[in-house]
A protein has these predicted regions:
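Bacterial N-terminal signal peptides that target proteins for export
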Residues: 1-12
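Boundary at the C-terminal end of the N-terminal hydrophobic targeting segment
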Residues: 20-22
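Active-site-proximal alpha-helix that buttresses catalytic centers in soluble enzyme cores
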Residues: 24-126, 130, 142-185
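Short SAM/SAH-binding signature in class I
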Residues: 132-134
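Short beta-strand segments
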Residues: 136-138
Length: 185
């Protein structure tokens, strides 16, 4: 317990330092208590799905992350460092895989690929999975996924300039949405 608190504090300190140097908004590492009590007073686990758009990229057909994008990918790993992830999904593009790399290395979890052309099928697949999940997508898929999991209509992501949304969708044991939170990282 003490070690996790100390890790969270040091994670916050390094995140604050990096944010001050980069002049970006500060989002602290997220630590989740994944239990909820249902109406029968039985404890059941919630599932948390984190959804982000890939970080900043170079131009081109299948570009890699820019230097700013690489920093944002590291920031994402810091933000999620206090939360155990069971699965990480990306599309089969350099920019999404590179955004998830620091997280998969830090969490020692494998990366799985999904097809962004069939978000309905992927959403249904997510609902069959257990544990906490990170999904790295695109400006035209991230909000669709959030809505597909039960959230209200989302404001579209500004394609050229918006890379900092972190949606946190919490589902109960019956796979019903409990809450949706939008953070900036």
């Amino acid at each position: 317990m003490k070690q996790s608190i100390i890790r969270a504090v040091f994670g916050c300190i390094s995140l604050i330092s990096a944010s001050l140097m980069a002049q970006t908004p500060i989002v602290a590492p997220i630590a989740l208590n994944n239990t909820a009590v249902n109406s029968d007073n039985n404890t059941k686990s919630n599932q948390v799905i984190f959804i982000v758009r890939h970080a900043e990229k170079f131009a081109g057909k299948d570009p890699s992350l820019s230097a700013q994008g690489q920093l944002r990918a590291l920031r994402l790993a810091k933000v999620l460092s206090s939360t155990h992830l069971d699965k990480v999904y990306t599309t089969d593009y350099n920019r999404t895989r590179e955004t998830a790399t620091a997280v998969t290395q830090d969490q020692q979890v494998d990366l799985s690929v999904y097809d962004p052309r069939d978000m309905a099928a992927f959403t249904q697949h997510l609902l069959t999975q257990q544990g906490n999940i990170l999904v790295v997508g695109h400006s035209n898929t991230s909000t669709d996924l959030v809505e597909g999991l039960g959230a209200e209509k989302q404001i579209p992501i500004a394609d050229a300039s918006e890379f900092d949304r972190l949606y946190i969708v919490t589902l109960n044991a019956n796979k019903q949405m409990v809450s949706t939170v939008l953070l900036r990282y």
